[in-house]
Amino acid sequence: MEGNRDEAEKCVEIAREALNAGNREKAQRFLQKAEKLYPLPSARALLEIIMKNGSTAGNSPHCRKPSGGGDQSKPNCTKDSSSGSGESGKGYTKDQVDGVLSINKCKNYYEVLGVTKDAGDEDLKKAYRKLALKFHPDKNHAPGATDAFKKIGNAYAVLSNPEKRKQYDLTGNEEQACNQQNNGRFNFHRGCEADITPEDLFNIFFGGGFPSGSVHSFSNGRAGYSNQHQHRHSGHEREEERGDGGFSVFIQLMPIIVLILVSLLSQLMVSNPPYSLYPRSGSGQTIKMQTENLGVIYYVNKDFKNEYKGMLLQKVEKSVEEDYVTNIRNNCWKERQQKTDMQYAAKVYHDERLRRKAEALSMDNCKELERLTSIYKGG
């Protein structure tokens, strides 16, 4: 299954790139593929957010790259256009600093999002969209903006999930401990353990990043996401899509292939015994022999006498007698069962003819078993 895990992680990475590019449908398709290959918690968390909030992605106004070929250092904004000295200068305003300080001072998730404890899904989405755009590190360069952005994502992730929200309401203020232990990552099923990054959550809501075309750095526990350019070759993705059908068929056929291989190996490893209790012309076991102890008849091929002598012959004859006694014992049990059934039927139906027939059964195997038993006892 580890091979499937690697393929699933590749699918998750492709899904993340699709989210950065604003292609939610492609992201959802590759996350579903990852789910089939291996149950990664990160894939499940991303897929749940897309299914729950996918319809809102890209609907809120925020910065986008201009479609033309002009100056790409100036974002085409429809909201929050007054941002101090602008992104190109990496400056920030006093309002941005005050906002970051205000978020980082909040003691619980409800304060972070600025909602009441009975806030519904729409209230949470509205609050998250507003704050995520305002504090995204590609837009807000004030000191502490990254931590504030993580805090906002963590708050929405917990409060938007009914189970997490219920747990959070019961345990009280654990937000600070979560941030210290997991550096801002969050999980929908296992406490504060991370499975989805704030950037992934943002991309699910807004269908892509800011005009810088970069992924801001979030170092968090098991994974670190560095600043990197998003111009990627799509050849591998197309190859993944084309190869999906063949790989799925291979996975489905794997159990059958394994069974066939095991069957072939077992046949190769198990050799035929050098004797038979009955003559078998197909294997050449037609030469009649008799065991020294019980006088059991068995059949061998023409090379047997040359290959089995002394101790080897004694072992073979012991196996012959054990097989013979086992067969006689089983056949005797069948004879007794048949006789008992006939006697019972004769009694129920008052059938004298059937009773006489039951009494007349020869019981040859049982007689042979008695003979063998007397020999064993030295009689």
From Swiss-Prot:
Gene3D superfamilies: DnaJ domain. Residues 108-172 form the J domain. Acts as a co-chaperone with HSPA8/Hsc70; required to promote protein folding and trafficking, prevent aggregation of client proteins, and promote unfolded proteins to endoplasmic reticulum-associated degradation (ERAD) pathway. Acts by determining HSPA8/Hsc70's ATPase and polypeptide-binding activities. Can also act independently of HSPA8/Hsc70: together with DNAJB12, acts as a chaperone that promotes maturation of potassium channels KCND2 and KCNH2 by stabilizing nascent channel subunits and assembling them into tetramers. Disulfide bonds: none annotated. Belongs to the DnaJ family. DNAJB12/DNAJB14 subfamily. GO terms for molecular function: Hsp70 protein binding. Residues 266-379 are lumenal. It is found in: Endoplasmic reticulum membrane; Nucleus membrane. It comes from Bos taurus. Its main location: endoplasmic reticulum. This is DnaJ homolog subfamily B member 14. Keywords: Chaperone, Endoplasmic reticulum, Membrane, Nucleus, Transmembrane, Transmembrane helix. One of its GO terms (biological process) is chaperone cofactor-dependent protein refolding. The lineage of its organism: Eukaryota, Metazoa, Chordata, Craniata, Vertebrata. Residues 55-94, 221-241 are annotated as: Disordered. One of its GO terms (cellular component) is nuclear membrane. Coiled coil: none annotated. The chain crosses the membrane at residues 245-265. PROSITE patterns: DNAJ_1, DNAJ_2. Residues 1-244 are cytoplasmic. It is a single-pass membrane protein. Interacts (via J domain) with HSPA8/Hsc70. Forms a multiprotein complex, at least composed of DNAJB12, DNAJB14, HSPA8/Hsc70 and SGTA; interaction with DNAJB14 and HSPA8/Hsc70 is direct. The gene is DNAJB14. It comes from the Eukaryota.
